[in-house]
A protein has these predicted regions:
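Intrinsically disordered, charged low-complexity linkers and terminal tails
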Residues: 1-193
Length: 193
């Protein structure tokens, strides 16, 4: 068992190593006991989020429907449509599904999205740009909340395994229906779907 002085020395060495690697800009890493975490959560009115709440958290996030563009809607509809039994999606297949929606709008003479959207024919024909766009937004919005992951080596996007396991077919259908309704409402002022 380490003495308090030994713990402090180890912590100082660890902080020096971390600082020398440029990982953190501060010299000390803050550590919180479970009771401190609970007190902070309570004082800031923060909810408890873990695997037991992930499905509820996901459904709440979908219900928020906070949109700048239609990207999150098309992304999630594509993910649900293409996911295999493990909740995994080949990113190349997702890119094709995603861009097809916007290209079809262009082909029909409809606005792709709001006026300041970067998606035009040239952009959508550049698969590298589309992939980069998907991974920065909308994917990142879902990843930040631990709902989806990206394996660059395998070229796969995946739902969080616990989330996927908890989603019944009825749940997936309900989310799909909501997203379609949100999409319909979103495009109402942009020439409809």
């Amino acid at each position: 068992m380490l003495t308090e002085n030994q713990k402090n020395e180890l912590n100082k060495k660890a902080c020096k190593i971390i600082k020398s690697k440029g990982i953190f800009k501060t010299e000390m890493l803050k550590k919180f006991s479970p009771s401190d975490v609970e007190a902070i959560r309570t004082s800031h009115n923060l909810g408890h989020h873990d695997d037991s709440t992930i499905l509820h958290d996901f459904e709440s996030f979908i219900d928020e429907n906070t949109l700048t563009f239609s990207f999150k809607l098309i992304f999630m509809l594509s993910m649900l449509r293409l996911a295999d039994k493990e909740g995994e999606v080949n990113i190349d297949s997702l890119i094709e599904e995603y861009r097809r929606f916007y290209i079809e709008r262009l082909d029909r003479g409809l606005p792709v999205d709001r006026p300041n959207c970067a998606y035009n024919r040239e952009f959508l024909d550049d698969l590298v740009k589309v992939k980069r766009s998907i991974l920065s937004n909308p994917f990142e919005k879902f990843e930040r909340k631990r709902f989806v992951y990206y394996s660059k080596d395998l070229n796969i996007l995946s739902f969080h395994p616990v989330l996927w396991e908890q989603m019944t077919q009825e749940t997936k259908d309900g989310i799909r229906d909501k997203e379609r309704e949100f999409l319909k409402a979103y495009y109402e002022k942009l020439g409809g779907l």
